[in-house]
Amino acid sequence: MANKIQRSSHIYSFCIADALAVMSVDLGSESMKIAIVKPGVPMEIVLNKESQRKTPVTVALKENERLFGDSAMGMSIKNPKIALRYFQDLLGKHIDNPQVTLYRWRFPQHELVKDERRQTVIFKLSHEMQYSPEEILAMVLNYSRGLAEEFAEQPVKDAVITVPVYFNQAERRAVLHAAQMADLKVLQLINDNTAVALNYGVFRRKDINATVQNIMFYDMGAGNTVCTIVTYQTVKTKDSGTQPQLQIRGVGFDRTLGGLEMEYRLRDYLVKLFNKQQPSKDVRQNLRAMAKLLKEANRLKTILSANADHVAQIEGLLDDVDFKAKVSRQEFEDLCSDLFQRVPGPVLQALSSAEMNLDEIDQVILVGGATRVPKVQEVLLKAVDKDELGKNINADEAAAMGAVYQAAALSKAFKVKPFIVRDAAIFPIQVEFTREVEEEDKSKSLKHNKRILFQRMAPYPQRKVITFNRYTDDFEFCVNYGDLAFLSQDDLQAFGSLNLTTVKLRGVGDSFRKHLDYESKGIKAHFNMDESGVLSLDRVESVFETVVEDKPEEESTLTSKYTVLLPKYIWVARNSVLTPPPPTGPFTVLFIF
């Protein structure tokens, strides 16, 4: 371990100040990895109470006790109803979302009810114990901070948290809400694929030069698959000279393709074998037995990645009856044949969004535990048409280490060597509004207008201004997602509402009546997509211009601009997906009424 720390400190030059440690949390579907930076320790993965480098994202809720990590996983076998897993898939989802339907199928032991106020999901464990997915995540984040503080031996408040690149505005805000409940200051939500790319680049800083390198990262984890094309090169900056840069060029994903789905195929196969051995019993009717079979399927999947066959065995599976059955890798691959056919999909999506072809990709690197499945590698290698797949990155910890490097860079306590990150928003966003127009026959009609705010793969952080030139009275506009034709039908249904919010402006007419002697330069709405990929409406203003003559001295005519902040607007979250209060909709409104 000492050698690892020494090697890291050679790469990073930290300037230690009197401040607290910072942390990162890589929130995977199945498990999380936590990393810290503190004075004297450049970067380190946090060990949990069992001295493990990763911790199951599982919460077991008893009447007077909360269990986390391995302890909670143990309860998922003993009492499956109280152990909550994979709940991140429910963040920001309405009760009728297909992701909720899938969750109910995967975990029938949990009762999901509707939050009548927000139309979202509530876990109902009892009449007194009801929690939203955000509250469950807040518990996990609070626990992760406790582990970090125990490991760092000092308080930790600031964190960078990873999220899937395909998280939309509602999902990102749900994570921020959870962090707020956990009293964590989020320095940034970083896309997990970007964190991996940053970790890769930081440790290869010397290999990055003015020549473009295009690297494809293929990340298949427990719950999802993401393919990312990243361009590395050095660029000149005004403040710090020539520095390395990574740019996210293309992204493809499959929300439900991962190790968990493979485990369910194996579990159902084991169910079939047991029921065949014991025709008088039906293991499906016993929640504990089904939980045991899912756990064994997880173990079996891992072993079959290294062996041609293995014997699955569970003592006392049902009514003290033991279960034993031999399963081959070929049987496993046959069970998951349709899943393996989906492996190339994210690659094709990433190439399409980057407008690149395979010849331009210099290397393909594997990330994520499920890429260890041999058939995944076989299908992927054929899809990318390369001689080999890169395995020169820590598939489990790359995102956590990249995120903690970013945490150090954002913290005022440390100074790190600059590494420029240009992330990209994969979902386009547009502003839509309707205004009255006059036809040739002098009749009036309504015209629907669309203005692109952020295109697909637009870099962020970035500020944008939309100008409305033809309004002289109160009006409204909608902020919606743009063209999502690149999504599959399943992804589109899981995406949720395409409407982010509706903004009703009040006070427009008053501002015009008060400035009749001025020339209007339009009504400007100022938007900001921050480092976390979260969109906000900063302010709305009317801009007027007038000509001021200064005759006595310079005999010149000057043009003067006059900006009027609109005194009031009403913001309506119509058809909005979950947004944590306050505010009660998808925009953070930084506006003084």
Residue ranges and their predicted role:
Residues 2-7, 11-102, 126-130, 139, ...:
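Oxyanion-binding/catalytic loops of NTP- or PPi-dependent enzymes
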Residues 107-114, 465:
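Short amphipathic beta-strand and strand-loop transition segments with alternating hydrophobic
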Residues 132-134:
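Hydrophobic alpha-helical hairpins/lids featuring a short glycine-rich hinge
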